[in-house]
Amino acid sequence: MVLTGATTQAVFWGTRTILQMMEQYDGAVPQGVAVDWPNYPKRGFMLDVGRKFVPIGFLRDYVKIMSYYKMNCFQIHLNDNGFKKFYGNDWSQTPAAFRLESTVFPGLATEGAHYSKKRIC
């Protein structure tokens, strides 16, 4: 087997193609030539953690899953607030969340459901 690619990322994704083929063929790789490239320069997924918090470990696992499927963009929607018109035009009753720790605005992050700088890095 020979695997080539124009970049190290291309070679890595080539290994994902081989692993995916092995899943389909019970651990074997069929004989032949495979030429593989993405149809789109950006292949990604958006996850809304502003409305529904998920642990940082889940995000890290998701990055690995996305890489397996050759996705190269991960947009994480980190903050959100509801529409005050649905809550009696009262911002204090409107659901809101901010998921990043801030040293400039320390009280902004949602208590118990945010990503600290230490955990992200």
Give a label for each model feature:
Residues 1-121:
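Feature activates predominantly on carbohydrate-active enzymes
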